[in-house]
Structures are given as structure tokens and as C-alpha cells.
Amino acid sequence: MSMHDPIADMLTRIRNGQQAKHQQVTLVSSKLKEEIARVLKEEGYIQDFFIETLPNGLKSITLKLKYYHGRPVIEFIKRISRPGLRVYKSYKDLHSIPGFGVAILSTSKGIMTHVSAKVKGVGGEVICEVA
């Protein structure tokens, strides 16, 4: 079976892992997934992540999930721009996310939160929203 949206798969694994109270989730790595993980760590949504090379040459990324008083830190994580419907926003159209959340964008200056994009004056593709 081919995977049409690896980012949606990553977000679903995080969501399912937290619902099942897993300490970590592992998935096949890519540069985009690594950058999304970096932003999630910087914003305090995951404890840490690490990348390892498997014997077959592929790289995997393991995300250490974060809990607060036994409850998942991530209340919701949702894919916005998808292969069938890309969503782009200019920095002027970036608004706050309910519940102190962040939108993660792919911009010409790299992967960043909507707050960073607004400060830098760049727009881009809205990958997902996290709160």
C-alpha cells in the first residue's frame, strides 16, 4: 500500500500514541518530518525526538510524547494543507489558534510557527495546527 500523505500519517501516529498513553512513537523519517518535530519540541508539545539510521539504510524518527498530570499535552493536532487541497496564507492572514495553539507553516525561510512567520513577514503553506 502506498502512502499518499506521510505528514497526515505522522500526525495520526502522534494523536493515536497519546490516546493510548504511549511514551514514544516511531516512524520513517524525512527532512520535513524532522523539521515539524523540531518545531513541536521548541513549542513544548513533545519532550524530545531522535533520528537513527536503520540497517537497511532508511532513517527513522522517534518522538518522545509529553504528558502533564497524566493528560496529553497536545489537545488536538490537525492537518490543514493536504495533497488534494493545498492551503497557503500570507503573513497578513495568519491569525491566532484557539487554546494557545500554533499553526506550523512551510515558508521560503523554513518550517516555523505562524507567530515566527508573522514576525519575519513571510507566508507559506499551512501544514497543520496544534494545541
From Swiss-Prot:
The keyword Ribosomal protein applies. One of its GO terms (biological process) is translation. Keywords: Ribonucleoprotein, Ribosomal protein, RNA-binding, rRNA-binding. GO terms for molecular function: rRNA binding; structural constituent of ribosome. The keyword rRNA processing does not apply. One of the primary rRNA binding proteins, it binds directly to 16S rRNA central domain where it helps coordinate assembly of the platform of the 30S subunit. HAMAP family: Ribosomal_uS8_B. NCBIfam families: PRK00136.1 (NF001109). This is Small ribosomal subunit protein uS8. It comes from Legionella pneumophila subsp. pneumophila (strain Philadelphia 1 / ATCC 33152 / DSM 7513).
